[in-house]
Amino acid sequence: MKNEPVIVERVYNAPIEKVWKALTDNNEIKQWYFQLENFKPEVGFKFEFSGGPDDGPQYLHLCEITEIVEGRKLTYTWRYDGYQGNSVVSWELFEQGEQTRLKLTHSGIESFAENGPDFAKTSFNGGWTYFVNDALKNYLEAGV
């Protein structure tokens, strides 16, 4: 596998403050992403959640926030309990008038290649495309 990150970008009909809140407020995160226990947008905060293919095994994701730029960027490590590999997920926001452009980058996924087909780049691409283009969009733009 080439060392190319998964990158998914989307423009939302929502102000940047609303998108940031959807990414960092525990009550909002669970509406479109995963249930995260007491999530706090602070460097060093560790969180975990289970997820995987709808018809397959669920994997325990282990994450730690490494960078916060208030209202603009959230970065955290991403690995799996009991599996080799480490990666980094970054959510970046860019104001575009009354809209917001989001850029999701998941780098280092090649380190999971030996763990099986659920860890293939196509799997990550499909998952992130769903969360960025469908789940988050529908949450942010409901009632717009």
What are these regions (language model features)?
Residues 1-38:
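Hydrophobic ligand-binding cavity/cleft-lining segments
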Residues 3-4, 43, 57, 85:
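Residue-level preference for beta-strand/loop junctions
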Residues 1-12, 16, 94-105, 144:
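Aromatic-glycine hotspot motif
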Residues 19-20, 29, 47-49, 65, ...:
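Hydrophobic pocket/interface hotspot
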Residues 7-13, 40, 48, 64, ...:
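Generic structural detector for well-ordered beta-strands
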Residues 38, 55-101, 107-110:
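Hydrophobic-ligand binding "helix-grip"
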Residues 101, 108-144:
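A conserved amphipathic terminal alpha-helix motif
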Residues 6, 30-37, 49-55, 77-79:
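A short gly/proline-enriched turn/hairpin at secondary-structure junctions
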